[in-house]
Amino acid sequence: IGVRLVGSEMCIRDRAYTHKILTGRLKEFKTLRQENGISGFCRPDESVHDAFISGHSSTSVSAALGIATAMKLSGDKTHHAIAVVGDGASTGGELYEGLNNAGKSDTNIIVILNYNEMSISKNVGGMAKYLSSMRTKESYQRTKGRVERMLDKTPVIGKPLKNAVRNSKNAVKNMILHSTMFEDLGFHYIGPIDGHNLEELEQGLMAAKAVNKPVFVHVNTIKGKGYAPAEANPGEFHGVGSFEIKTGNPDVVLSDSFSSIMGKELCEMGEKNKRLCAVTAAMKYGTGLQYFAKRFPERFFDVGIAEEHAVTFCAGLASMN
């Protein structure tokens, strides 16, 4: 969940593979998730470039806020702590706990949402596109900041005028962009941005750096973009092991993997015990539970990436003897 940049820290989750390749572990990448090989997540004991150890999901905002606060306490006002989260993390409660705390903090934290599906809220027409593009311009953010500071120093009418302009602007912007959720939490919202357009992405990130408050950057992407097997079966390529590049077929036959054997055995147990249920935190394929889900759909529960909820939910199930 952490990437150590030059003077900054980036807390990430499922972008760790790309990060490992870019930070000198290309040769070791063939040992990914193997005994004595490199980890599938960021680990500080593996590389000086890994800022923080990771788990499944939803933890990066909390970690980034801690890092941003530590930088602030040390007197560092220049650099940023960046949390990169996927839309799957939105089912995890810790994400919202972190956002709730971070949005009201006086820290240099940037949260980047990598959204693989459709837009969080449908934006309306050309005006929405224009406003979104304006908000991703660094020059706009810096000019806006200078004007606000000038109005703050203007006697008598300065602050009331600034508040009136801001309220009018927010009313129009929220009506068109529907960005109130994140801004109500205290973030400056930028986006949505096309994550496959590098120029637009760079422009948005530069604009985020120019904002002197917590920033939420909404980036839309297509999972597996450019690789047909992954685009066709994104679920099967989540946390994937080694595979044949041309076809996308795994090197290890799925039926022979530990997860598949466990999943099939669980089905046999489910036949004998009608009270047996299976619960997963958005990892049906990774845990081999797709077989159980198909055979016993009424006893299979995918609660999303919400491990705390999953454990207590299981306890509630088990309590009804």
Language-model region placement:
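Single conserved hydrophobic/aromatic residue that forms the stacking wall/gate
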Residues: 1-7, 12
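Beta-sheet entry/capping signal
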Residues: 8-9, 79-82, 108-111, 187-190, ...
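Non-catalytic terminal/interface segments that mediate subunit docking, oligomerization
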Residues: 8-9, 213, 221-320
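N-terminal structural subdomain of ketosynthase/condensing enzymes
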Residues: 16-40, 136-154
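Short acidic, glycine/serine/threonine-rich loops at helix termini
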Residues: 17-24, 90-99, 121-132, 202-204, ...
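A glycine-rich helix N-cap at a beta->alpha junction
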Residues: 28-38, 104-121, 139-142, 301
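Thiamine diphosphate
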Residues: 43-114, 282-321
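Long, well-ordered, tryptophan-enriched scaffold segments
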Residues: 116-262
